[in-house]
């Protein structure tokens, strides 16, 4: 059978998070709750920023874009996972699997670069406050967001194109709850050396470059904060950055655990646990992290709800 015909006819079976029948309903309810909070939190954040003039600043423009990405890549993964918790045959078509892989990579890579853009925004705000409006113009902000999505699209196109050249003839059971790169490579009966090299290069670049950029930004930020004379000013600066830094550590920590090792050295069960963090937990936490400790967001929300 040719690869073209095989690809059109193939179905995969998603192994899911666990095979224990007694855990399927509790896990369904847990992840349904997480997904509802994710959707409400991120769409609510986008709407709040859109209708509140107080939040029409570069920082919240990036936060709105981040909320959009969190909503999208959670929605690429979670609905199918919820269906599989209740289904007997957890099948996914080859074409659906490739589409899921493509959009997952687009949004997860874009998330990393948006977090980097937000770090740069904080760097300019704290280290060059007088030039902030000139540097972080609407054109620059839009360009940074577009660059994040372009790099996500380029990474997804490369991974998906390389994956579609592989044959899957050993087994159709994917030991994961969604179509990710590593489980698919482990399933293929083709030579995957090129795919593994691409994974190492692309994942390494998309993790190392943003991490270094964030680290450099925060090194300058810390230096500037330590030279602020008033304790109130230092406290305000730390408060502005702490939420973002927390999101960065959680996101890049889980990504690094997943992709900074060769596929052969990864335990797929460990990968499932790590994947849960950046596919379901992080999209839920981000709007909470950025809103609970943010006076501007709480003030805007109060104004929308009570009109004061």
From Swiss-Prot:
Compartments reported by the entry: Cell membrane
Membrane topology field: Multi-pass membrane protein
Disulfide bonds: 97-189
GO molecular function: G protein-coupled receptor activity; odorant binding; olfactory receptor activity
InterPro entries linked: GPCR_Rhodpsn, GPCR_Rhodpsn_7TM, Olfact_rcpt
Primary localisation category: membrane
GO BP of this protein: G protein-coupled receptor signaling pathway; sensory perception of smell
Extracellular-facing ranges: 1-25, 76-99, 161-197, 259-271
Alphabetized UniProt keyword annotations: Cell membrane, Disulfide bond, G-protein coupled receptor, Glycoprotein, Membrane, Olfaction, Receptor, Sensory transduction, Transducer, Transmembrane, Transmembrane helix
Cytoplasmic compartment segments: 47-54, 121-139, 218-237, 293-308
Expressed in which tissues: Expressed in the tongue.
Homology family: Belongs to the G-protein coupled receptor 1 family.
Protein name as it appears in the record: Olfactory receptor 8D1
Organism: Homo sapiens
Lineage, top ranks: Eukaryota, Metazoa, Chordata, Craniata, Vertebrata
Gene encoding the protein: OR8D1
């Amino acid at each position: 059978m040719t690869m073209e015909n095989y690809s059109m006819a193939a179905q995969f079976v998603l192994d899911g998070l666990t095979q224990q029948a007694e855990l399927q309903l509790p896990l369904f309810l847990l992840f349904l709750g997480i997904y509802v909070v994710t959707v409400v939190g991120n769409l609510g954040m986008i709407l709040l920023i859109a209708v509140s003039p107080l939040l029409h600043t570069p920082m919240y423009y990036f936060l709105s874009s981040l909320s959009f990405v969190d909503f999208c890549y959670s929605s690429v993964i979670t609905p199918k996972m919820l269906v599989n918790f209740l289904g007997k045959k957890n099948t996914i078509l080859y074409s659906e699997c490739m589409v899921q892989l493509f959009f997952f990579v687009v949004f997860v890579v874009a998330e990393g670069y948006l977090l980097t853009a937000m770090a740069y925004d904080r760097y300019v705000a704290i280290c060059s406050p007088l030039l902030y409006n000139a540097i972080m113009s609407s054109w620059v902000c839009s360009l940074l967001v577009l660059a994040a999505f372009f790099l996500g699209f380029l990474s997804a196109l490369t991974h998906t194109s390389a994956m579609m050249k592989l044959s899957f003839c050993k087994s159709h059971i994917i030991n994961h709850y969604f179509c990710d790169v590593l489980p698919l490579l482990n399933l293929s009966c083709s030579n995957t050396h090129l795919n593994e090299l691409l994974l190492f290069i692309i994942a390494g670049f998309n993790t190392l470059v943003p991490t270094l950029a964030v680290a450099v930004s925060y090194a300058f930020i810390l230096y500037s904060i330590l030279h602020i004379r008033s304790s109130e000013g230092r406290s305000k600066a730390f408060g502005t950055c702490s939420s973002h830094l927390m999101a960065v550590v959680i996101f890049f920590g889980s990504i690094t655990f997943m992709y900074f090792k060769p596929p052969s050295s990864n335990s797929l069960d460990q990968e499932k646990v790590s994947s849960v963090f950046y596919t379901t937990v992080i999209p839920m936490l981000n709007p909470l992290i950025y809103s609970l400790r943010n006076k501007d967001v709480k003030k805007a929300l109060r104004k929308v709800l009570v009109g004061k």
